[in-house]
Amino acid sequence: MAVPGRRNGVMDEEDDEDDVLFDDGDALADLDLDSDVPPHLRALVEAAESGNVHALRSALDNHTGSIDEPVEDGDTVLHLSCLYGYFPCVQLLLERGASLESKDEEGAIPLHDACAGGFTEIVQCMLNSAGSPDFVMQLLSATDIEGDTPLHHAARGEHLDVVKLLLAAGASPKKTNIYGKIPAELADQETEVRSILIAAAASADEVSCQ
């Protein structure tokens, strides 16, 4: 699904209408439900996009298919709830068994969307739900079609708390995307996010040399 505008150290010439902005965790404006959303999934999408956890619970109770069925653009309902930042909806979906590993058309898992939006509480919840340390690392290392990890997305959005959380959980500050950029290079110059990521990468270098 949509994530904050790309910044990979190269000039991106994208139309303004393609840029998606997140402001202090505010949800995106509601998307219009169109023919791309199958009729039997529209109740799920409406609930996820509005953050109505009661409507979502009802829609799930009446849904006979998979909870991980793509609803639009390859997104699952969990992707949408993470994208919009609706924590109660994320909690409900995880309780119902929604997959943390489902990928959308851009290769992103729900954690990518939560990190892109700077939704710290959701990110923490998803890492807690992973269960094992190995699965946590699997999620932290997941890459989308541009080779970005969740940490790349958090860095690009300059979400300090999420960056700190991901680093503490074991995310690599040295992983490069397909443009050869580490997370620090996606944050603006002279920001705390960039400084923390540069320091983390340097520390990782020191450890690897020991």
Give residue ranges: language-model regions.
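Alpha-helical adaptor scaffolds
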Residues: 105-108, 112-138
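N-terminal segments that cap or nucleate solenoid repeat domains
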Residues: 29-77
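Conserved ankyrin/ankyrin-like repeat signature
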Residues: 55, 88-89, 121-122, 161-162, ...
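Ankyrin repeat domain, specifically the short helix-to-loop turn at the C-terminus of the second helix
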Residues: 60-65, 91-98, 125-138, 164-171, ...
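Ankyrin repeat boundary/linker residues
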Residues: 37, 71, 104, 143-144, ...
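Ankyrin repeat A-helix N-terminal signature
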Residues: 46-51, 80-86, 113-119, 153-159, ...
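Ankyrin-repeat-protein effector appendages
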Residues: 2-43, 168-169, 178-210
